[in-house]
Amino acid sequence: MFISKRNLSLLALFVFVLQLFAQGPNNTGTYYKAATGMKGQALKTALFAIISPHHNIGYDGLYKCYEQTDRRADGKVWDIYSCTTNFSFSDNVGGYKREGDMYNREHTIPQSWFKKASPMKADIVHVIPTDGYVNNRRSSYPFGETNSPTYTSNKGFSKVGPSCTEGYSGTVFEPNDEYKGDIARIYFYMATCYEDRIGSWTNGTGNTVIAGNKYPAYNPWVIKMLLRWAKEDPVSQKEIDRNNAVYK
């Protein structure tokens, strides 16, 4: 799935970014013309129609793409689940016994929720490189917040534990504050890009997050949390650079 930074930023914040509609490819001001003046569900559906054509790079193609989309300034893999890893892009084979052994492909929306179906399984917007061990500890738990973690990655960067977020008390995976906005925007993108599918992503723990409909797509506690995350962690240069690389 290829999507420009303008697309992703808009989709991520579709409930309150009408002011961005004037932008488009090469600043032509035409890309979002069909969605001008819309709001709420109508806006989301209009954006879905605009971005739905896409190119599927395939699951096996993700690792090669990561070399462009998730490269740190020092040439290592940009891992948002761990702050202590220094993976080379070839460090994606073999097993892991501890944090730092290898990285793999993490589905921010667990693929078990949508039964590993395509094209979601290989959508590089939401399938990101992360430490394999920490990814495994995340399992298919929803994203959330915990104040009594049962597991923390090195230096307390990521956490697993009972939710302290109002509206949900189950086990959650809490990413670091500096990436919560990134994840929120990915989730809004997924709700928009797959508007015609997301209602069925309720397998396993999916029903704790997915509302079973096109709009608003997520359960109230999730929407409230994601909007707060998006506000508290605005779009970073790292996020812009990644989206630009994905678009290429």
Where are these regions (language model features)?
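Bacterial Sec-dependent N-terminal signal peptides
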Residues: 1-25
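Intrinsic disorder/low-complexity detector
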Residues: 9, 29, 81, 245-246
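A generic structural signal for short, non-catalytic loop/turn and secondary-structure boundary residues
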Residues: 11-13, 72-73, 98
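N-terminal module-boundary/linker segments of secreted carbohydrate-active enzymes
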Residues: 21-86
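Intrinsically disordered, low-complexity segments enriched in small/polar residues
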Residues: 22, 27, 56-59, 92, ...
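Short amphipathic alpha-helical surface micro-motifs
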Residues: 59-64, 85-86, 91-93, 111, ...
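Short, His- and charge-rich active-site/binding loops that engage polyanionic ligands
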Residues: 77-79, 83-102
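Domain-level detector of nuclease and nuclease-like folds
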Residues: 95-248
